[in-house]
Amino acid sequence: MSVTTQDNGKPFPAEPLLTIKPMDIKNDIYIMKMNDKLYQRLIQSEHIIHAKVESVLGQISSWKYATHELYVPAPYQNELAGLPSGRIRKNVEEKDRLKIAGLYSFGFDAEGKILCSQEAPENIENGIITDIYEYDDAFSYHVFHVRYIPNQYTIIISISYFYSYHEMSIFQGINAYKDWSVYLYEYDKGRISKVHSYASCWGDREAEEYNFVYDNNILCAIVGEKRLKNGELDIHWKNKKVYNKES
């Protein structure tokens, strides 16, 4: 079966080699040091985050809308997290985007790069859950996940970072309580072949591994490395349009 990826517009390194020795993402020193750096950046950003959010909102050139998360730069985050992908909502006016509870708004710059996402709250006085994207280069970026109260203040909930590391890429984040999580992507010929994930709240549990199964140039399933107790495949996610249980 061929291994490729769907045309989802998400950035992958060009033709990397397969990693020779998988990282122990629970205990890897580099990942631990990155957690420390991210936490320090979270703390240092607390006094400037409100101005940063309002500055980014002022840079938005266009908005798109959906019923759930849809424009997520990190590869397959919805699928890996078991979350539904949003459906595009049309005929939404910008002035009404925060009045429709549960509506997701995605803000883009003039070049079409996503700068932020917001979920319209039930009560705007309780704040708007907002993601602010800050790019280091064409591939790596930080995400500030915040609660934004317009014209008042902003609270940082967590900070995440997507970056390349040797032949792999990593998406990891940490919150104000130092709880952290990490996704490590392995590639084959420039395309995702496997993802390892771990969250600190899992304690002694082993990191999870997921294999990406493709057919006819389309991702058809994300399958757990280990089988279920009954011997069945652990199908974490499947593309209902193309998935064939017998393949």
Q: How should these model regions be labeled?
A:
Residues 2-247:
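Buried hydrophobic residues that stabilize the cores of well-folded domains
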